[in-house]
Amino acid sequence: MRFFATLVLALPALAMATAVPRDVNGGTPPKSCSSGPVYCCNKTEDHLDKGTTALLGLLNIKIGDLKDLVGLNCSPLSVIGVGGNSCSAQTVCCTNTYQHGLVNVGCTPINIGL
């Protein structure tokens, strides 16, 4: 029974372990984009996705003519992880941030090999 309890408590910690992203040439990822910092978003969605447009409407966020992705639950890459940059989700550059990173619009994925 103790083994099972220990396993149940250890699994979330193992799931949170992330790899350090590297660019395609083996270096570390960029710390900023031309529009600001590199973000790590838990999820990216098409700006035309019905659920995404509903969320944007609820938060009164108008994206205008943007045709890029919408990043959800994003954090600047420089504050993620302990002892260095890491991201286990999608790294992106975004033009606008709302709700302290809850929603980022105008996002473009960054090609970083993990």
Swiss-Prot record:
GO terms for molecular function: structural constituent of cell wall. Its main location: secreted. This is Class I hydrophobin SC16. The gene is SC16. Keywords: Cell wall, Disulfide bond, Glycoprotein, Secreted, Signal. The keyword Disulfide bond applies. Disulfide bonds join C33-C93, C40-C87, C41-C74, C94-C107. Belongs to the fungal hydrophobin family. The keyword Signal applies. It comes from Schizophyllum commune (strain H4-8 / FGSC 9210) (Split gill fungus). Glycans are attached at N42. Pfam families: Hydrophobin (PF01185). The lineage of its organism: Eukaryota, Fungi, Dikarya, Basidiomycota, Agaricomycotina.
